[in-house]
Amino acid sequence: MATILKQKLKTFFVPTAITLLLSACNSTSLFENSVTYLIKQEAYASSEFYINKAEQTLNSQDKITYQLLAVRKLIDENKVVEAQNTLNDLTTRLNIMEQNPLQQLEYQLVTAQLAALKGNNHQAEVTLQHISAANLSHSQLLRFYQTQAKIAENSKNTIEAVRIRSLIATQLVDNKLRQENNDKIWSLLRNANRGMLSSAQAGAGEMELAGWLALIEIYNQSVSTPAQMPQNINYWKRLYPNHSALAVMPTELQRVFNFQQTLLNNVALLLPLSGDAKILGEIIKKGFDDAKEQDPTIVQVFDTDSNSIENILMQAKQQGAQMIIGPLLKSRVNQMLASDQIRDINVLALNATQDVKPIVGVCYYGLSPEAEARSGADRLSRDGYTKAIVVAARDEFGQRSAEAFAQRWRQLTNTDADIRYYNQPLDVITTIQNSANNLQETALYALGNAEQLLEIKQGLENSTIAGQLAIYTASRSNSPNNGIEFRTAMEGVKFSEIPLLADHNSNEYQKAYSLADSDFSMMRLYAMGSDTWALANKFNEFRQIPGYSISGLTGNLNAGPNCNIERNMTWLQYHNGAVETTN
């Protein structure tokens, strides 16, 4: 594969029957009627348009051409099933395509594209080997390289994917396409393992790739000191004056040049300090105050249960607030997001609605089960598992967590997690046992409280698949009431937890333990208050510097999509009746 990826623009592949047929013709003009010629060009219409054209035409050759164009656009639109169905229909008429090498070539190309999209690398590679790059139009050649890049991405071979996309960059003239390609390259590099990137090297003459590797190295070295980022990137520009990113900078990096360090002198803290949620607001405020200590920043405190959100926002702004922190309750967050009062002020909401919307100047932070579930998916993938079974209680917590895990798992692996909901924990053991064929590289993410988790663990141990599944779970099962018997029964189970509760010897733990009367749920809220202060003081960094992170009491914090603060949590494991940190 590496040999194929490194071939230059005019390299020829092993001839096949198709290429022999093409080379036997002195000219392809025999096959280029006004419709067939479209195959060699960009396809600008929608898949629906080409499907309709295929249904309307009476000419068999034109029908095939329109179907090929439809498959191409269905792939672009990520409509895998529809693309495969249309391709299957075309396969039944290969005898007609044998009369038209242009259609044969396009058929091979879209077959490879679709195989790569579906993650079938072997089929995609074999099909590409049967295509001669010299016979491709410029539009087709770009798709040829994009398919190679997709194969590399499927294989988690970041450097090869970037190498191919660097080659694509030299072939693009449309600025929109150049921007999309550079954004994709940057996304691959930003999400790659830093150790792997540090050891990667470009080959002789690969200046485009060398430039990308140098740029990501500068970025990663500067991300913790964002104020130095523009100067360091300008230095990179002088080293690579002809690089494609110089003309079309990745979208993420464009924000870096407008970065201004966060400087606070007046903030408004909106919490429920009366009513049913008073106890929650008070412990969060205590964590916030303890983290702030003697900092001179003015903090205006507002009780969201004693006044309307609209009035509070107006008053806070009149009193000079630069930032709104809060509210905590979802209903209040929704009211705030609907207000025009937040259009010209930064906001750190302490909760997120189900469908977080991107709003300029707004970030979302909280101890949501979704954030922890996404962290769980990250952990299973990092530990090398390629298949995940999720068991969750059939309640709001279980459904929210399972759906968030599944969404992240799909992003990480391009496969679906096997989700199973239960009313009684033991119900799900039977279904897993009956459907278990091959559990290699499979892990179980079990969601529930301590009692439910215990039933699941013991049920698995008494089943025919005992010992075949690594078990992971979330912090909900971790309670100060879990004694030695529970910890012994949980042998080998790994669970996520906030850093505060992972280190019982820290001063922060001792303080929170005392304030919360040993209630882990309240201790988590104390930690949230502490991290809220830290986030507020680095608000611009999180908004404008992708990858910026800080270590907090609730996790390693970074900004995800729509400035939704993600938490990379500490992982612990039950071993010999105790709890220990796991790498």
From Swiss-Prot:
Transmembrane segments: none annotated. It comes from the Bacteria. It is found in: Cell outer membrane. Its main location: membrane. SUPFAM superfamilies: Periplasmic binding protein-like I. A lipid is attached at residue 25 (N-palmitoyl cysteine). It is a lipid-anchor. GO terms for biological process: peptidoglycan biosynthetic process; regulation of cell shape. Belongs to the LpoA family. Interacts with PBP1a. Regulator of peptidoglycan synthesis that is essential for the function of penicillin-binding protein 1A (PBP1a). This is Penicillin-binding protein activator LpoA. It comes from Haemophilus ducreyi (strain 35000HP / ATCC 700724).
